[in-house]
């Protein structure tokens, strides 16, 4: 017998639901467009010009920057240190194409930040600062910059992948990772030339300075930005003082693991379970460490209760949690015995910690 196929009728789609979805999408897009509009003109291109053998200035690199302050006839731009490093002259190009000479007010290789000043007469927008401490994983963010040095004010969209990621970096280019940088991780595309550009939230607030990207073929969607709450105190120091004055113990050090096992056992006399720390190899005369009674071959394992496993840990604890003039409790081993010393911190010199 002939059997008739039973066709299932399609479920009616509510026109109201469709309208709501379309409205929601439009509202989301409006938020994004509005956020970009609040910041886009505050993002600039930064061109690094260096003297050639012929005596002329040649462009050696380009990056991005963000105008974060306007005061009288000056406007202030934050960018990455590596964008301006070695420049004999800097040019800042505004969003409308106006090129201005820029002056470096201060540089900080440790955090990869620099502050520039430019003439403010053509500046039409200043970035509004947000609060990077309130970021949540999954939150929508936008990166604005100058990718490849030729596509000014490009916008990419992504999310916060992680709000407190620690990335080891080599600040003095000696091949050793000597500082742990706390960064925002995002999957918003951050390409060559985006360095120094803005990472903003959907309110159009600056929440990070785009900095590093893991440049490996096998890694996609991994970009980093310096949280604005980390960057702001440094920006202020660079703007006002031209440098960041950081605290030091007054010691020269090496990581425990740089020493052969025989030296660790015979000279340092470390317990078997102590495999990480930093070894004092010298002290600055009249430094806080010397006055506190510390000596060569002391092995530091904690400062104010925070573990010190490496040079990078020491710098992170001192730079983030301490100030010049404060006293910190240093826990160390001497001759196999665990001891503590209260060390008053002084202003850092280039070769001492």
Residue spans of the language-model regions?
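Short, conserved beta-turn/loop elements at beta-strand boundaries and strand-helix junctions
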Residues: 51, 70-72, 107-111, 162-169, ...
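N-terminal activation segment of mature serine protease catalytic domains
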Residues: 2-56, 64, 89, 236, ...
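Gly/Ser-rich catalytic serine loop of serine hydrolases
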Residues: 61-64, 126-131, 183-198, 280-291
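Active-site loop architecture of trypsin-fold serine endopeptidases
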Residues: 50-59, 87-90, 124, 144-157, ...
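Conserved active-site neighborhood of the chymotrypsin/trypsin-like protease fold
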Residues: 67-150, 308-311, 317, 325-329, ...
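C-terminal recognition in membrane/secretory proteostasis and scaffolding
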Residues: 1-10, 103, 136, 201, ...
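Terminal peptide-recognition signature
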Residues: 41-47, 65, 75-79, 102, ...
């Amino acid at each position: 017998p002939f059997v008739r196929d039973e066709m299932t009728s399609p479920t009616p789609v509510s026109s109201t639901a469709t309208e709501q979805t379309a409205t929601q999408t439009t509202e989301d897009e409006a938020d994004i467009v509005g956020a970009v509009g609040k910041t886009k003109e505050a993002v600039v291109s930064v061109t690094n010009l260096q003297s050639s053998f012929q005596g002329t200035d040649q462009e050696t690199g380009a990056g991005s920057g963000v105008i974060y302050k306007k005061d009288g006839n000056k406007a202030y731009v934050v960018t990455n240190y590596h964008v301006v490093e070695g420049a004999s002259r800097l040019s800042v190009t505004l969003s409308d194409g106006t090129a201005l000479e820029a002056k470096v007010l201060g540089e900080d290789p440790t955090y990869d930040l620099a502050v520039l000043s430019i003439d403010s007469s053509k500046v039409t927008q200043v970035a509004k600062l947000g609060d990077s401490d309130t970021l949540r994983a999954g939150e929508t963010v936008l990166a604005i910059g100058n990718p490849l040095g030729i596509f000014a004010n490009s916008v990419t969209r992504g999310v916060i992948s992680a709000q407190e990621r620690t990335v080891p970096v080599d600040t003095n280019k000696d091949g050793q990772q000597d500082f742990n940088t706390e960064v925002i991780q995002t999957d918003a595309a951050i390409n060559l030339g985006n360095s120094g550009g803005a990472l903003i939230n959907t309110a159009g607030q600056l929440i990070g300075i785009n900095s590093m990207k893991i440049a490996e073929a096998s890694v996609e969607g991994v970009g980093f930005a310096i949280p604005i709450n980390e960057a702001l105190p440094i920006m202020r120091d660079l703007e006002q003082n031209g440098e960041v004055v950081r605290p030091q113990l007054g010691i020269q050090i090496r990581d425990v693991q740089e020493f052969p096992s025989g030296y660790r056992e015979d000279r340092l006399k470390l317990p078997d379970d102590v495999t990480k720390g930093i070894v004092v190899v010298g002290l600055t005369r009249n430094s806080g460490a010397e006055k506190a009674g510390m000596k060569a071959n002391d092995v530091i394992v904690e400062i104010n209760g925070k573990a010190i496993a490496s040079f990078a840990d020491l710098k992170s604890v001192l730079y983030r949690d301490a100030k010049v003039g404060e006293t910190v409790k240093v826990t160390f081993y001497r001759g196999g015995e665990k001891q503590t010393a209260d060390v008053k911190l002084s202003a850092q010199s280039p070769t001492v910690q």
